[in-house]
From Swiss-Prot:
GO biological process: mitochondrial electron transport, cytochrome c to oxygen
CDD domains in the cross-refs: Cyt_c_Oxidase_VIIc (cd00929)
Transit peptide: 1-16
Gene source species: Pongo pygmaeus
Gene Ontology CC annotations of this record: mitochondrial inner membrane; respiratory chain complex IV
Protein name, entry field: Cytochrome c oxidase subunit 7C, mitochondrial
Sites of N6-acetyllysine modification: K25
This protein's UniProt keywords: Acetylation, Membrane, Mitochondrion, Mitochondrion inner membrane, Transit peptide, Transmembrane, Transmembrane helix
InterPro entries listed in its UniProt record: COX7C/Cox8, COX7C/Cox8_sf
Residues that bear N6-succinyllysine: K25
Subunit relationships: Component of the cytochrome c oxidase (complex IV, CIV), a multisubunit enzyme composed of 14 subunits. The complex is composed of a catalytic core of 3 subunits MT-CO1, MT-CO2 and MT-CO3, encoded in the mitochondrial DNA, and 11 supernumerary subunits COX4I, COX5A, COX5B, COX6A, COX6B, COX6C, COX7A, COX7B, COX7C, COX8 and NDUFA4, which are encoded in the nuclear genome.
Pathway named in the protein's UniProt entry: Energy metabolism; oxidative phosphorylation
Transmembrane helix listed as a keyword: yes
Highest taxon, organism lineage: Eukaryota
């Protein structure tokens, strides 16, 4: 009896918590505008690529 009520409760919770599905719907940013996505990706990957060079430049200018 208790097992059936627990099973009924968990399946109803899963059924009520429905999210949008499809490509790009599970990402924390919008992929609708390709130019905005391009700018965000360039900023993200560009900063990761440039950081070691900026650190080396800072260290060389320090001495």
């Amino acid at each position: 009896m208790l097992g059936q009520s627990i099973r009924r409760f968990t399946t109803s919770v899963v059924r009520r918590s429905h999210y949008e599905e499809g490509p790009g719907k599970n990402l924390p940013f919008s992929v609708e505008n390709k130019w905005s996505l391009l700018a965000k990706m360039c900023l993200y990957f560009g900063s990761a690529f440039a950081t070691p060079f900026l650190i080396v430049r800072h260290q060389l200018l320090k001495t």
